[in-house]
């Protein structure tokens, strides 16, 4: 009796640092009772992004040493950074949405992609400006 197995491989690149200077301002956010947040200037949009790709197309790399379908993890990092440079949106969620579509459109061998992002808070520091302290 033979048993057929279905395998799926997943791998990726974690903690890709992303810094987008002067991203589009986030404005017009309706406040909710729990928060007074209505937007931010986005002088610096900073985050860490994790990429995990999966699918059956990567099996040959593990069973036959055939890496033709593998997307190198450094290529994943470079792909994230390249798309951050041209990102015109205001939120990390929007960036991850666009990035996920771009991964799937660019690399046909990827069946699924999981993206996780952690936004890093940026608070402007006070710096001397014409004899007084102002926001950096």
PLM regions with names:
Residues 1-136:
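N-terminal intrinsically disordered, cationic/polar leader segments
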